[in-house]
């Protein structure tokens, strides 16, 4: 093979590789931007979550930003196996994507006083 043929082959290989990388980058960008993540803030304070009733959609990615005002509360969604401690002054991020319709209960699972059992809420997942 002559030098010119090798040079052309190398140039063509570089062009094909560059085009492939560009297409992969575009595909990744489209995927990342086609499903934006909905952010929902939840505040825990003694005996309540605010809000305590939240509507979600099946397949919609959600980022929960949960904080505590007064105590180390727990955040537990038993049906999804989600659990976290909520430390006052910190925001705890939790990602989730509901996969079916229905009601998902959440609750505080760190005892925080006499009305602790009242500290709960729900996600209502719609189609």
Regions found by a protein language model. Give the residues of each.
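C-terminal segment of N-terminal export signals and the immediately downstream linker at the start
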Residues: 27-57
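Soluble periplasmic/extracytoplasmic beta-strand elements of cell-envelope proteins
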Residues: 41-43, 63-65, 76, 107, ...
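Beta-strand-rich interaction surfaces with strong enrichment in secreted/lumenal proteins
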Residues: 52-54, 81-85
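Extracellular/periplasmic metallocenter environments
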Residues: 22, 26, 88-127
């Amino acid at each position: 093979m002559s030098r010119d043929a090798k040079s052309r082959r190398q140039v063509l290989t570089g062009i094909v590789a560059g085009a492939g990388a560009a297409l992969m980058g575009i595909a990744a960008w489209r995927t990342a931007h086609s499903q934006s993540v909905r952010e929902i803030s939840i505040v825990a304070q003694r005996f309540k979550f605010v809000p305590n009733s939240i509507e979600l959609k099946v397949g919609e990615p959600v980022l929960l930003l949960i904080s505590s005002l007064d105590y180390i509360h727990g955040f537990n969604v038993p049906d999804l196996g989600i659990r976290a401690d909520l430390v006052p002054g910190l925001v705890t991020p939790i990602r989730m994507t509901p996969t079916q319709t229905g009601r998902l209960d959440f609750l505080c699972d760190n005892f925080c006083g006499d009305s602790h059992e009242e500290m709960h809420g729900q996600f209502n997942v719609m189609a």
